[in-house]
């Protein structure tokens, strides 16, 4: 684990991503999260294992380039986003949708 998030692992995970592709990946025990763009794979693994009490077997990360957006005549950039696809060990799961 890197020193950047020492003791603050909850800051690594921003939110789960619920897209059509991410929902299909749930069948294979893979969960997609938006994470801090400075987070390394050991940080992400430690945060997921600590927050959700599961065993992580693999992580794939994607760091797409920032996209330009316009507001009238002003151009700006969207915030940097990093995605992580986390594979869990057999028998582990994360409850993303609370049962009511």
UniProtKB/Swiss-Prot annotation:
It comes from the Bacteria. Keywords: Ribonucleoprotein, Ribosomal protein, RNA-binding, rRNA-binding. The keyword Mitochondrion does not apply. GO terms for cellular component: ribonucleoprotein complex; ribosome. GO terms for biological process: translation. Coiled coil: none annotated. Pfam families: Ribosomal_L23 (PF00276). PANTHER family: 60S RIBOSOMAL PROTEIN L23A (PTHR11620). Part of the 50S ribosomal subunit. Contacts protein L29, and trigger factor when it is bound to the ribosome. Belongs to the universal ribosomal protein uL23 family. One of the early assembly proteins it binds 23S rRNA. One of the proteins that surrounds the polypeptide exit tunnel on the outside of the ribosome. Forms the main docking site for trigger factor binding to the ribosome. This is Large ribosomal subunit protein uL23.
